[in-house]
């Protein structure tokens, strides 16, 4: 009985993956809000201007960006809203 209980606890911890996933918004500025569970543990919000105006892109991880693009990376759920 103890072995079964211990097995269930271990499986629960592995499945929940404490601290290694993050819920991030993952849409562009013109789209309705959507979220994604990210394995990388970080969210980003990228902002730039072009002929359409200000563009905002959201997603997982923290990508490298070209000059002229602002990026904000964060590590809590839905922090890139």
Swiss-Prot record:
Residues 1-21 form the signal peptide. One of its GO terms (cellular component) is extracellular region. Keywords: Acetylcholine receptor inhibiting toxin, Disulfide bond, Neurotoxin, Postsynaptic neurotoxin, Secreted, Signal, Toxin. The keyword Disulfide bond applies. Expressed by the venom gland. Its main location: secreted. The keyword Signal applies. One of its GO terms (molecular function) is acetylcholine receptor inhibitor activity. Disulfide bonds join 24-43, 38-60, 62-73, 74-79. It comes from the Eukaryota. It is found in: Secreted. InterPro entries: Snake_3FTx (IPR003571), Snake_toxin-like_sf (IPR045860), Snake_toxin_con_site (IPR018354), Toxin_cobra-type (IPR054131). Belongs to the three-finger toxin family. Short-chain subfamily. Type I alpha-neurotoxin sub-subfamily. Binds and inhibits fetal (alpha-1-beta-1-gamma-delta/CHRNA1-CHRNB1-CHRNG-CHRND, IC(50)=1.4 nM), adult (alpha-1-beta-1-delta-epsilon/CHRNA1-CHRNB1-CHRND-CHRNE, IC(50)=12 nM) and neuronal alpha-7/CHRNA7 (IC(50)=400 nM) nicotinic acetylcholine receptors (nAChR) thereby impairing neuromuscular and neuronal transmissions. This is Three-finger toxin A1. It comes from Micrurus laticollaris.
């Amino acid at each position: 009985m103890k072995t079964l209980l211990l097995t269930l606890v271990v499986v629960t911890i592995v499945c929940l993956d404490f601290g290694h996933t993050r819920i991030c918004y993952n849409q562009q500025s013109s789209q309705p809000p959507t979220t994604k569970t990210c394995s990388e543990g970080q969210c980003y919000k990228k902002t730039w201007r072009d002929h359409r105006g200000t563009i905002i892109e959201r997603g997982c991880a923290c990508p490298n960006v070209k000059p002229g693009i602002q990026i904000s990376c964060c590590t809590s759920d839905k922090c890139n809203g």
